[in-house]
Amino acid sequence: QCDWSSDVCSSDLQKAADDLAKELAQYLWDQRDRLRPKVMEIDEAVRRVKAVLADPARKPLLFADCADNPGGGGRGNTIHVLKAFLENGIDRTAYGIFNDPQLAAEAHRLGIGSRFTAQLNRDETNKLSGKLTAPAQVMGLSDGEFVGRRGTMGGRKGSLGQTAWLRLDGRIDVVFITNRQQCLDTEMIEHIGIKVRDMRCVVVKSRGHFRAGFNDIFADEQILEVDSPGLTTPVLQRLPWTNLRHPIWPLEENMTWQVPAEVAVR
């Protein structure tokens, strides 16, 4: 099921309860366009970053890779935004946190300063995650232990597991972790040596909880949600639905609906 419902409880005023339930249902339907997610395509995100990189007077940007939010069940390792940034020459960017235990372990074996060809998601089988290969340098290593700075992690200990900071293609700094979780706090990136305030762009794998951890650096107008293929995309049309009754909004944009004459009584 994928429905709204309006439920009204009454001890003895059945008609009043029925009428109010219908009124609420109609209100919900009339407000449906307000609930459309406001996310941008990857191409637009690339354009915005290029503008920031070209003009020092522009404020830095923070992108939420909300379609791959581990807090909502995402795998924390889709490559789509990262790949687009690499292909378009984006630099001065921090990307965190990317769940790839195998790559983090490889970086620890090689050691700080080592250069190698990083194979992202080498053992991943989920098609949404994707694979990516890029030249990399090991910039930092840690055991992933940190103390949050503010927001939901403020003053709390966290553990990312074996963690590695890799500079991909000499331009983008990515934090690879072992314990999958969403990026909630700047310390998840900074504990290993990256300085968020020095970056012109930051990308986090989170949907909303990150805001309280980054809002002293990025104002609301500097925070943008970007959409891509992923398990937690808010754009429902992207998902491969099965066994879903039709028509249903928003998959059928032009569908019509009317409040039923009769309402269920329980």
How does the language model describe each region?
Residues 35-42, 92-102, 119-123, 202, ...:
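A generic structural motif
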Residues 9-14, 25-61, 71:
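Metallocofactor- and cofactor-centric catalytic cores in central/energy metabolism, strongly enriched
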Residues 99-148, 222-230:
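Acidic, Ser/Thr-rich peripheral helices and adjacent loops at domain boundaries
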Residues 1-8:
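Single conserved hydrophobic/aromatic residue that forms the stacking wall/gate
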Residues 29, 146-266:
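Extended hydrophobic packing segments that form well-structured cores
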Residues 49-54, 70-82, 107-112:
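Short glycine/threonine-rich loop-to-helix capping motif typified by GTGT followed
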